Amino acid sequence: MQFELDNTDGKARRGRLKFDRGIVETPAFMPVGTYGTVKGMTPEELDETGAHICLGNTFHLMLRPGTEIIKQHGDLHDFMHWQKPILTDSGGFQVFSLGDLRKITEEGVTFRSPINGEKILLTPEKSMQVQRDLGSDIVMIFDECTPHPATESEARQSMELSLRWAKRSKAEHGDNPSALFGIIQGGMYEGLRDVSLKGLEDIGFDGYAIGGLSVGEPKEDMIRILDHTTDKIPAHKPRYLMGVGKPEDLVEGVRRGVDMFDCVMPTRNARNGHLFVTSGIVKIRNAAHKTDTSPLDDKCDCYTCKNYSRSYLHHLDKCNEILGARLNTIHNLRYYQRVMQGLRDAIAEQKLDEFVADFYAQKDMPVPAL
């Protein structure tokens, strides 16, 4: 992987990630394909939304179908028929999500499979091996996602364990040609974030992710840690904000110098009838849309907006038709990609402030201070 920076506007950056499998323009939003599919989308439809990289989930794919079956097809790209880049997370966050069902030791995390109850040990080495088998273009280190809330002592202990696991991840990654990203932890404590980043830089990674945010903390805490941390990541390396978020969060992340984002929000919300539009959010199952023959968003160029009315989408939602979830997903993913394209163009033209002002004005929201 090569990372090139083309333009900056304030702290915001425009560039590209170059892989053997293609180029990803940054800032980039990466749709989440947990089980080797972005829910409801064919790879061709995903490509048409403007996505050029997606996520796979190490934890879930390791449990089902398992890497042996995936390797029989070649790798995850061949298995899911997506020949563009794939980033895989390490499984750390999913294990964190298991709560009391898991036990953390120096060696790794022991948990019971949510599928069959089998006892499984996931270590940094195992995570790297699984991600190598998946053929990931960007591999994430295995870390412990610090829970929120955590005392400074708890956050330090968690962060230090993650640093030791980062060393083991790097050693196991070895000669794998895929990019390897470190993950900055440290909870809501700026000093711990600094120690984490310094430790990761000493080990050396191809990119750096900001982890442990969007885990239930107040928005102002997320912004505070983002403000503190993003600038300190080496400028020549890509910066990835994990698991974030709403369209406004993407805009605020880009304003602070973030290059990459992922989140289940556009796809999950689509399946629940919550649709992102230029003016805000449309809840398509509301009765107000029953007779509305206008498109979902007249500024959107997606397949859904070009061909269907709000009334039809409301009807599909009321009938629980699968097509409704699919059309909603196409729209939400395209909306996110249009926001990212708008940000990239604005940075290139040195018009980011104008873009941001317009973005918030159309939603009737004030522009947050930087």
Swiss-Prot record:
Gene Ontology biological process: queuosine biosynthetic process; tRNA wobble guanine modification; tRNA-guanine transglycosylation
Keyword tRNA processing applies: yes
EC number(s) given by UniProt: 2.4.2.29
Matching Pfam families: TGT
Single GO term (MF): metal ion binding
Assembly and interaction partners: Homodimer. Within each dimer, one monomer is responsible for RNA recognition and catalysis, while the other monomer binds to the replacement base PreQ1.
Protein name: Queuine tRNA-ribosyltransferase
The species this protein was found in: Pseudoalteromonas atlantica (strain T6c / ATCC BAA-1087)
Lineage per the UniProt record: Bacteria, Pseudomonadati, Pseudomonadota, Gammaproteobacteria, Alteromonadales
